[in-house]
Amino acid sequence: MSEQQYDTLTGLLRAKKNVILQGAPGVGKTFAAKRLAYSMMGVKDAERVMMVQFHQSYSYEDFIEGYRPSADGFELSKGAFYSFCKEAADDNERDYFFIIDEINRGNLSKIFGELFMLIENDKRGEKNKLQLLYSRERFYVPSNVYLIGLMNTADRSLALLDYALRRRFAFFTLSPGFSSSGFTRYREAVNSPAFNSLVSCVARLNTEIASDESLGEGFMIGHSYFCGFVGGTVDHASLSAIIEYELIPMLGEYWFDDQEKVRLWSEALRRSIQ
């Protein structure tokens, strides 16, 4: 992420309080979210960052509060976001960051409930308390809580976000960073002709994916698939594993109705590291 992009993103988050980082697989959404939180804090304080992952079974009871089985029957238990907000309210001079991975996998209306209104930037604070569903407690979202949602744009099985929720978030798209100054320095440190050749091939593949009417830029392959190497550790086996077990299966899903295209690009990827 460039310095200009970072400044834009921090400005959005400060103003809106709620941001969704969206992008193709492997563009570094999780890394960017945590880095954004720590940089806005000015210190790496993991105690002020919480991350949850939404899924189809995730509910209001997990997020806010609900009754859970206990030895004596059922008892009211507090959810992750409720507990996080209470902690932030007791420390209102410092910023807190709540990260939601796969935010578009959950039933958002069901999960957020009455908090749809409370997460808005101008509905924060004690003066906007609302009564919770089960406990009848009057609850508010503190102004020092920032929400960062992460959304994979290449998952075709997911519905579009609820418009009511979409209005309450700013959306920031992360793209593959192969041409960024940071990744260029990383390539120089890796110092591998085969690695460079594979990255160049993937860049051409991304051009093909972006121009495909059934796919588009949201399906491009991110740079994170190729991170983690240090100088001298790149070998044919590790690059081949990325191709065979990560990239080619993905292409099989993308072009399930065009196996010839999958075959041609699979061969191109394999040739790139020969």
Question: What are the residue ranges of the model-derived segments?
Answer:
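C-terminal regulatory/interaction module of P-loop NTP-utilizing enzymes
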Residues: 1-274
